[in-house]
């Protein structure tokens, strides 16, 4: 029986028909979907070349993004929706103006919009990123910070009624562009730092409410302008004059700075080296910059935004900096920080001092002003009254100015009294006013002696110094560069009438003992004066009181201590007045004539150290009457002439001047030529006295000479005046055992104790 076979065939045919119908229905359905997606793609604001190649998923995400953007941009005001002509013209320039690209994020982090120039910054197409989540293309370490930026917190507290909608942060996104401009796969992409800044924009629901009575919640959108930070090695455009480069260590200390900072801010590049950049930040911007530097070392690049940087001489300038961390190619460790600094303004508030660095330049100016104020002479009220009077007495003006300012110059007085200049130069026919220089005030000014000055400085005293006797004519062949004119001391009319008056005053420093000489030995002689003839003046130096030498206890006075040489300190005893026979009255003709300070008595040929009164003469010559030339009894001694006209201290000055001249001659000539005798040792009479004696080298020498090589601190005692049983008006000082053992030469001048050796020897003796 064939009854069971036929139903099986019918069931197979029906199932195949159903499947075919199902495939046809699905195919029709897919066709309709494709038509719908095609129509939907045509509605997207994209070119046809782009939309024709989109898949359904891309069309859907692009459509959703478009709807979000429409929702964000929709407003109730129809007037604002009308696009103006100016806006249409500027729309094409907005993207060119910004260096980066525009990105709009939804509350969930979806990129609902990106501008077309994102491809130039990241190498990714706009269509490939729109509608996707931003977390898929950002660095995992930045996700938490990004979520915080997406959250829109409404102001619930009373203090903040309006929430802060501004955002500024740094985001690392994938970049498929290489340094050469090529595009790589997304899997091989690198991280690029973007400075994202803008605000949160909230879309409010329309006024109508849902039938249930609930209002739709507001939808926040994060609108960002993403600016990439260029690497310093990839900067193509040349930097302008308002931009300077700097390199820093990892603790932000300067290691290099461009020279253009000098014109912009006043700093020299050398002044900034090894200095922290935080020293030059405005205090109000320090916190912001510190956070920025944290981002720098965490993400590799940063842009500081606008901040204030201090100028050198006061004030500040607005600066924006793009900083980049440079990594080592071998171990990928950070090495340094390179900054591109853009100066946005000039120096503002220049007079405002904001740090101690800015006040250093002001200190010299303040000191200058203080010195100028202190140097201005004070005019007494009497002088002020004299100025108001129509006629000025020039003599009283100068004498009173001397009382108020004894050290002021004539120029300073005339500058303070300009009306006196008209009286100093009278017109034709006027009576010439004679200035009286014999007033008591001028005598007081000459008697006053200023304090000790620095021996290394030239004297600035205007007082008279005694002229010095130069070499005799017989010694001209020894020192050819020295002037051979004999300098004489002439007495004025005042000194002839009043023998007790002071015709000369003492110089301020030992350098005033110098005499005119050639320029080639002038500097050398001044140095020799400092080294060999520096001695403490026995007269007390004070501008306030004048006392006689015999009334002072010099052991109680503090001597002048030089700071640059090792001089032996000792006290000086008061000197006896000079006696050289009975003083004879001076005639007017002798007073007007010149008196020679040195005499050539039994002179050895060619030797300036041969006079009995010479400081370096032999004791045998001074003590033996047979060797010394007899002096006429009626001829007055030069020292007695000085006692008639010059005080005791003025005589000592002339003797020091002679010693300074002889010291220069010894410096220019050899010792044997200056003395003219050979070396010969001879003991000086007296216990404990050891002297260095030279011996005659010539066979016809009639006598021996003793040369004393003493330390410079004995110069004042060598110049001392005494009359104790000596045929010569000058006697040699009494040398102690201490002086001879420490300072006497033992084998030539090269074996003298110098510097530290002399100090150690003094310490052992003490």
Curated annotation (Swiss-Prot):
One of its GO terms (molecular function) is protein dimerization activity. Residues 490-503 have a biased composition (Low complexity). Residues 479-489 have a biased composition (Polar residues). Keywords: Activator, Cytoplasm, DNA-binding, Hydroxylation, Nucleus, Repeat, Transcription, Transcription regulation, Ubl conjugation. Residues 304-347 form the PAC domain. The keyword Transmembrane helix does not apply. In normoxia, is hydroxylated on Pro-426 and Pro-559. The hydroxylated prolines promote interaction with VHL, initiating rapid ubiquitination and subsequent proteasomal degradation. Under hypoxia, proline hydroxylation is impaired and ubiquitination is attenuated, resulting in stabilization. In normoxia, is hydroxylated on Asn-743, thus abrogating interaction with CREBBP and EP300 and preventing transcriptional activation. The modification (3S)-3-hydroxyasparagine is found at residue 743. Residues 1-26, 361-383, 475-509 are annotated as: Disordered. Residues 7-26 have a biased composition (Basic and acidic residues). Induced by reactive oxygen species (ROS). It is found in: Cytoplasm; Nucleus; Nucleus speckle. One of its GO terms (cellular component) is nucleus. InterPro entries: bHLH_dom, HIF-1_CTAD, HIF_alpha-like, HLH_DNA-bd_sf, PAC, PAS, PAS-like_dom_sf, PAS_fold_3. Residues 82-159, 230-300 form the PAS domain. Its main location: cytoplasm. The keyword Ubl conjugation applies. Residues 17-70 form the bHLH domain. One of its GO terms (biological process) is intracellular glucose homeostasis. Efficient DNA binding requires heterodimerization of an alpha and a beta/ARNT subunit. Functions as a master transcriptional regulator of the adaptive response to hypoxia. Under hypoxic conditions, activates the transcription of over 40 genes, including erythropoietin, glucose transporters, glycolytic enzymes, vascular endothelial growth factor, HILPDA, and other genes whose protein products increase oxygen delivery or facilitate metabolic adaptation to hypoxia. Plays an essential role in embryonic vascularization, tumor angiogenesis and pathophysiology of ischemic disease. Contains two independent C-terminal transactivation domains, NTAD and CTAD, which function synergistically. Their transcriptional activity is repressed by an intervening inhibitory domain (ID). This is Hypoxia-inducible factor 1-alpha. It comes from Oncorhynchus mykiss.
């Amino acid at each position: 029986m064939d009854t069971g076979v036929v139903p099986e065939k019918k069931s197979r045919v029906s199932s195949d028909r159903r499947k075919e119908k199902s495939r046809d229905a699905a195919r029709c359905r897919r066709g309709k979907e494709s038509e719908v997606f095609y129509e939907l793609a045509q509605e997207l604001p994209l070119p046809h070349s782009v939309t024709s190649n989109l898949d359904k998923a891309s069309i859907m995400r692009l459509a959703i993004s478009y709807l979000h953007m429409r929702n964000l941009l929709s407003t109730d005001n129809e007037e604002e929706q009308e696009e103006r002509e100016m806006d249409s013209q500027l729309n094409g320039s907005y993207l060119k103006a910004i260096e980066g690209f525009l990105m709009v994020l939804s509350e969930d982090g979806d990129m609902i919009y990106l501008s077309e120039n994102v491809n130039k910054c990241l190498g990714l197409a706009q269509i490939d990123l729109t509608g996707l989540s931003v977390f898929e293309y950002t660095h995992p370490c930045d996700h938490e910070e990004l979520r915080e930026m997406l959250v829109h917190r409404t102001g619930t507290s009373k203090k903040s009624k309006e929430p802060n909608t501004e955002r500024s942060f740094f985001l690392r996104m994938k970049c498929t562009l290489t340094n050469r401009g090529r595009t790589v796969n997304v899997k091989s992409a690198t991280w690029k730092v973007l400075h994202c800044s803008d605000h949160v924009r909230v879309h409010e629901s329309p006024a109508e409410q849902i039938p249930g009575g609930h209002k739709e919640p507001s939808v926040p959108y994060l609108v960002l302008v993403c600016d990439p930070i260029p690497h310093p090695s990839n900067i193509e455009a040349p930097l302008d004059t308002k931009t300077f480069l700097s390199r820093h260590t990892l603790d932000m200390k300067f290691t290099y700075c461009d020279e253009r900072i000098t014109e912009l801010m006043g700093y020299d590049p050398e002044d900034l080296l090894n200095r922290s950049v935080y020293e030059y930040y405005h205090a109000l911007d320090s916190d912001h910059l510190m956070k920025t530097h944290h981002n720098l070392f965490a993400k590799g690049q940063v842009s500081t935004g606008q901040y204030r940087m201090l100028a050198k001489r006061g004030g500040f300038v607005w600066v924006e900096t793009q900083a980049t961390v440079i990594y080592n190619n071998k171990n990928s460790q950070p090495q340094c920080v390179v900054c591109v600094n853009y100066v946005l303004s000039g120096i503002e508030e220049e007079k405002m001092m904001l740090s101690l660095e800015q006040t250093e330049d002001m200190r010299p100016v303040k000191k200058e002003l203080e010195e100028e104020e202190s140097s201005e002479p004070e005019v007494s009220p009497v002088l002020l009254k004299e100025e108001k009077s129509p006629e000025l007495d020039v003599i009283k003006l100068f004498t009173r100015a001397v009382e108020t300012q004894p050290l002021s110059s004539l120029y300073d007085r005339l500058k303070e009294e300009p009306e006196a200049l008209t009286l100093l130069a009278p017109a034709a026919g006027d009576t010439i006013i004679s200035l009286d220089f014999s007033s008591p005030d001028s005598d007081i000014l000459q008697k006053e002696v200023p304090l000790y000055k620095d021996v290394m400085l030239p004297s600035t005293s205007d007082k008279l110094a005694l002229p010095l006797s130069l070499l005799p004519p017989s010694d001209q062949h020894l020192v050819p560069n020295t002037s051979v004119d004999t300098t004489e001391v002439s007495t004025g009319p005042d000194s002839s009438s009043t023998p007790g008056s002071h015709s000369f005053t003492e110089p301020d420093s030992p350098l005033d003992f110098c005499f005119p000489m050639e320029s080639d030995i002038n500097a050398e002689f001044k140095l020799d004066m400092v080294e060999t003839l520096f001695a403490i003046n026995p007269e007390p130096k004070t501008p306030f009181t004048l006392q006689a030498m015999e009334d002072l206890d010099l052991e109680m006075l503090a001597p002048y201590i030089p700071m640059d040489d090792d001089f032996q300190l000792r006290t000086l005893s008061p000197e006896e007045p000079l006696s050289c026979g009975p003083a004879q009255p001076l005639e007017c003709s002798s007073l007007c004539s010149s008196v020679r300070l040195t005499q050539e008595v039994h002179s050895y040929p060619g030797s300036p150290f041969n006079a009995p009164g010479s400081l370096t003469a032999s004791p045998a010559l001074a003590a033996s009457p047979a060797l010394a030339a007899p002096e006429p009894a009626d001829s007055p001694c030069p020292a007695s002439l000085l006692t008639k006209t010059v005080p005791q201290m003025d005589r000592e000055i002339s003797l020091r001047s002679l010693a300074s001249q002889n010291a220069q001659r010894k410096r220019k000539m050899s010792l044997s030529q200056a003395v003219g005798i050979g070396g010969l040792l001879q003991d000086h009479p007296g216990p404990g006295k050891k002297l260095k004696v030279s011996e005659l080298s010539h066979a016809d020498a009639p006598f021996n000479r003793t040369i004393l090589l003493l330390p410079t601190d004995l110069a004042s005692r060598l110049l001392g005046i005494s009359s104790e049983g000596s045929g010569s008006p000058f006697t040699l000082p009494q040398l102690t055992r201490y002086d001879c053992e420490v300072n006497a030469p033992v084998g030539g001048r090269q074996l003298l104790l110098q510097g530290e050796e002399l100090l150690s020897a003094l310490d052992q003796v003490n």
